[in-house]
Regions:
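Conserved class I S-adenosyl-L-methionine
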Residues: 1-35
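A short acidic, Gly/Pro-enriched loop at the edge of an enzyme's catalytic core
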Residues: 92-99
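A short beta-strand submotif of the Rossmann-like class I SAM-dependent methyltransferase core
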Residues: 102-104
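SAM-dependent methyltransferase
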Residues: 134-202
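Nucleotide donor/acceptor-binding cores
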Residues: 37-39
Length: 234
């Protein structure tokens, strides 16, 4: 789980561009395919950016995240949207949805494929018939290892980012924050790389039809660092 300090840094350093970009592409994809969505759920919703985008476009939305810090920010951002603090592996909402999303490499935080399968089975149950499950996972070939890279939040606060593999082959993001040149804190976020073909196989095992598995959601908006997967409940 992310620390409360990291959640604040995540929000203030402007990392919202990831769900913002995905939200624009998702809405365009829905329009292009003439798909009408009335309700949506965002798994691992973070600070609620995608939920806010969906709500502003007339879709009744909800969100959940394992991090209490992320959900606290989401509730402050959009108090009218229902948010749950929960474990995605066990999560069972009280109602069904037309669309379920899970972006920002959230599934790469799930270490075991057995837990991924549990998530897929649960999503299948709380999707409406004909509903869509759209998510992304890391594209291993396009992950840029290296650093440290620096980012200035303001005149006094600076972030340092290092991306590396550990001895298990997992991809790690080390975030270190300084204020006035003095160390404040650091956090390491670990992700495991999942084979997209294995992931698609698990979806099919759980009853989904896999409509798309590519490095983009829209043809004109390629996103080389992620695989985008679109699945439909039959």
């Amino acid at each position: 789980m992310y620390s409360d300090v990291f959640c604040k840094v995540y929000n203030e350093f402007g990392w919202n561009y990831v769900p913002e970009a995905f939200g624009e592409q998702l809405l365009a994809w829905l329009r292009k395919n003439e798909i009408t969505i009335k309700t949506s759920l965002d798994l691992a919703c973070g600070t609620g950016v995608l939920c806010e985008i969906m709500q502003k476009n007339g879709i009744m939305t909800a969100g959940m995240d394992f991090s209490e810090g992320m959900i606290a920010i989401a509730r402050e951002r959009t108090p009218e949207i229902p948010y749950d603090v929960a474990d995605m592996v066990q999560y069972q909402p009280e109602k069904n949805f037309d669309l379920v999303t899970c972006t920002g490499d959230a599934l790469n935080h799930i270490m075991e494929l057995t837990d991924i399968e549990k998530i897929f089975k649960n999503v299948y149950e709380y999707l409406n018939e004909g509903g869509y499950f759209i998510f992304d996972i890391l594209n291993e070939e396009e992950v840029s290892l290296g650093g440290p890279f620096t980012f200035d939040y303001n005149e006094t606060v600076q972030g340092e980012f290092l991306i590396f593999r550990d001895e298990k082959g997992h991809i790690n993001l080390k975030v270190t924050v300084y204020e006035n040149g003095e160390y404040q804190f650091e956090e390491i976020i670990t992700e495991v790389v999942h084979d997209p073909q294995v992931i698609c196989g698990l979806l099919q095992k759980c009853g989904f039809e896999v409509l798309k598995c590519a490095d983009h959601l829209l043809e004109e908006e390629r996103h080389g660092t992620a695989w985008f997967i679109v699945a439909k409940k039959l």
